[in-house]
Amino acid sequence: MQNKLCSLRLGTYALLSFALFSSSVRAQTLKEVAKFDLPGPGGKRFDYLTIDEDDHYLISAHLAAEQTYVIDLRTNKVIATVSDTPGVEGVEYVPELKKFYTSNAHDNTIGVVDLKQMKVIKKLKTDAKPDGSAYAAPFHKLYVSDERGKAEAIIDVRKDEIIKTLHFDSETGMPQYDPVTRKVYVNLQDENIFAVIDPVADDVIGRYPVGKCKGNHGMTLAPEQHRAFLSCEGNDLMTVFDLDKHQAIVFLPMARGPDVIKFDVGLKRIYVACSSGAISVFQMDDPDHYRKLEDFLVQKKVHSLAVDVETHRVYAPEQEEDGKAVARMVVYEVVSR
């Protein structure tokens, strides 16, 4: 009888273990398909990425190495290393001019990079620690958050001149341009406020609280669904903000240390790079309903990622592997949809 009970228990344990394993496999959202070294020194922090969809280039800011890489997504090869970008944080591509702009935190400038020459052709002085940036194409304006300067610098990209600077009582987080409402949004992360800028006159026309979200630093948009997604670094929440009602409607927990957040419009999937060692993944079922799919494990100190909307691949730079210094880009494909 005792042997039968033992066998029964072992069988039950095996079934439970198999079920948990199967569930874990089914729940996985991403798989690593490639990784390649980058030319900068290992162990140095990376920051924002942006994709040039015309040329299939990934532009990667290597903040602590003070340089920026241009990577061909078709070959996963670095085709250029742009220097003179000290402390580069934000990078933003302007397609019609074949230029991209770097937010250089270490000399408080915005660098103008000509993609044909692959070099900095001009620098614009800002207040303090320029960070994230967003391009409002119909207005030919680039909006750059001067995080520690508590400001938003506005650049006319046709002249490459700062035409206005908006000042706030808060550090500024990531801005975004909404092509549906034709408005610019910016996180006021010290005050937990979502600000709205009219790019016609470049006036602030609204300020709205973000509910339980603390430290709304990162932002991405789902323009067709009239939603903004915020990464709240103060309390590790992914917050959904209704752009019509101007209020936060959903709060979901994510891994510690959230930073850059991106939305895959085709899959309706939200990714957040978390420096504790995970990419938190969420699914939009409809504009009012969301599910957390998983905290996909990656190396620690991953702060940034980019999503290729054509291939749905996710790109994330790593500065360490199990504590060992590296400098590389990791490529992930979607497993479950």
Residue ranges and their predicted role:
Residues 1, 19-22, 291:
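Compositionally biased, low-structure terminal segments
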Residues 2-13:
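Bacterial N-terminal signal peptides that target proteins for export
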Residues 11-21:
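Bacterial N-terminal signal peptides
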Residues 26-337:
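Predominantly soluble domains enriched in secretory-pathway, periplasmic, or organellar proteins
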